[in-house]
């Protein structure tokens, strides 16, 4: 509880952006509305002193993390428009979108805690009893956090900082939506972001490839083969064409063997603003179909930055495409985030989200190092789904 009081007190003295920087995260240069957050949430999973490689261990850590996260969400809910404008360095706030996201996130957080608590025992400090509503959960979460064991107080402070920073990331996206579209919300029932994946089930996805021959795309695919995992690779048409010009379709078929490939558009441009966005999609889909076996190609499109037009649903339906977003972002493209940051961030978010679609980029080398560590730490606690199942998401 003292962290809530401390954090709220800091807001009366400092701008939110400065306050967030004081709680175990980093400050980055101010960025444009359409790019990334000015602050990236970081965590240190080494402060959690239990194994998370079994279902019971994962659920225990998930319950504890969700107790902290729920209170941080409640705290951040109190931010005024003026505080958000100053902290997020944006020009306007869509309060309706913010409130919609908060309601949804509180609901998901409650559901995730209920799932994590299915086999709770009274003696466990993370088990706060029956919580049928969000209000019940928030009241009991405060009591539960007060019982944090002494040896986990440093962990609690760290996760509190992470949670405030992560909620700030999401509030920023919600505040901008739909003026700047993103993964934070959906326009129609032909879009999904991973929130409806089953409990403790996760999908891997990679954007922006392929790289040149023997580049990080090849390294990433070799890693997945060694780990017996599959992923969906959302490729840029111009990168695929460039790679094809230096090899052939047979080589690319071998490269993506046992994996899935889908469209990221022809160029990495906002498909909400680009007047050639439809051609970008049809051109890329034509190249995919001409290059790779039908079984490898999924009828999915992932818009760069998650940006697409609010009225694009009819077009995607005419192309038999679903818009495939994500709900767990590694931020691996960010130069201020290293492999250790990614590993800790993704595990923490998996404990909070408990299911979904993980976003990485195979044009950067960090994921190929971070993922084997994540696989080892989680072991059999979660299920990594076959990439072909992503085509069935709704």
Model regions: which residues?
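Short amphipathic alpha-helix initiation/capping segments at coil-to-helix junctions
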Residues: 335, 339, 364-367
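Short, flexible, glycine/charge-rich loop motifs used to bind or transfer phosphoryl groups or to couple energy/partner
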Residues: 192-194, 251, 291, 346-349
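Metal-dependent polysaccharide deacetylase catalytic core of the NodB/CE4 family, i.e.
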Residues: 133-157, 162-165, 200-202, 212-214, ...
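Alpha-helix C-terminal capping segments
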Residues: 255-256, 349-350, 378
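A short, acidic, amphipathic alpha-helical segment used as a generic capping/interface helix at domain edges
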Residues: 339-351
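Terminal accessory/targeting
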Residues: 2-203, 215, 222-231, 354-394
């Amino acid at each position: 509880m003292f962290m809530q009081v401390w954090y709220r007190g800091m807001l009366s003295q400092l701008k939110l952006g400065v306050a967030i920087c004081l709680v175990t995260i980093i400050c980055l240069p101010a960025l444009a509305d359409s790019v990334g957050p000015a602050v990236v949430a970081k965590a240190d999973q080494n402060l959690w002193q239990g194994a998370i490689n079994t279902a019971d261990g994962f659920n225990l850590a998930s319950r504890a993390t969700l107790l902290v996260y729920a209170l941080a969400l409640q705290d951040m809910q109190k931010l005024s428009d003026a505080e958000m404008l100053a902290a997020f360095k944006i020009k306007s706030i869509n309060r309706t979108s913010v409130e919609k996201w908060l309601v949804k996130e509180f609901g998901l957080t409650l559901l995730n805690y209920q799932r994590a608590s299915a086999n709770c025992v009274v003696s466990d400090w993370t088990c706060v009893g029956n919580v049928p509503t969000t209000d019940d959960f928030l009241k009991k979460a405060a009591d539960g956090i007060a019982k944090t064991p002494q040896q986990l107080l440093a962990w609690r402070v760290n996760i509190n900082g992470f949670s405030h920073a992560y909620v700030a990331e999401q509030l920023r996206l919600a505040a901008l939506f739909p003026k700047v579209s993103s993964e934070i919300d959906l326009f129609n029932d032909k879009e999904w972001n991973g929130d409806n994946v089953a409990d403790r089930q996760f999908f891997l996805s990679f954007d922006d490839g392929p790289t040149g021959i023997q580049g990080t795309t090849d390294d990433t695919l070799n890693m997945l083969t060694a780990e017996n995992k599959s992923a969906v690779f959302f490729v840029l048409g111009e990168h695929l064409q460039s790679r094809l010009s230096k090899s052939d379709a047979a080589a690319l078929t071998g490269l993506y063997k046992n994996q899935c490939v889908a469209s990221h558009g022809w160029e990495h441009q906002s498909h909400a603003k680009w007047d050639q966005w439809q051609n970008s999609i049809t051109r890329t889909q034509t190249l995919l179909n001409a290059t790779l076996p039908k079984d490898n190609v999924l009828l999915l499109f992932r818009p760069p930055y998650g940006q697409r037009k609010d009225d694009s649903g009819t077009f995607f339906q005419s192309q038999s495409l679903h818009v495939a977003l994500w709900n767990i972002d590694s931020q691996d493209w960010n130069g201020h985030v290293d492999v250790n940051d990614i590993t800790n961030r993704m595990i923490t978010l998996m404990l909070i989200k408990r299911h979904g679609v993980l976003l990485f980029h195979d044009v950067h080398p960090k994921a190929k190092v971070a993922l084997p560590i994540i696989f080892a730490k989680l072991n059999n606690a979660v299920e990594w789904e076959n990439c072909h199942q992503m085509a069935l998401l709704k």
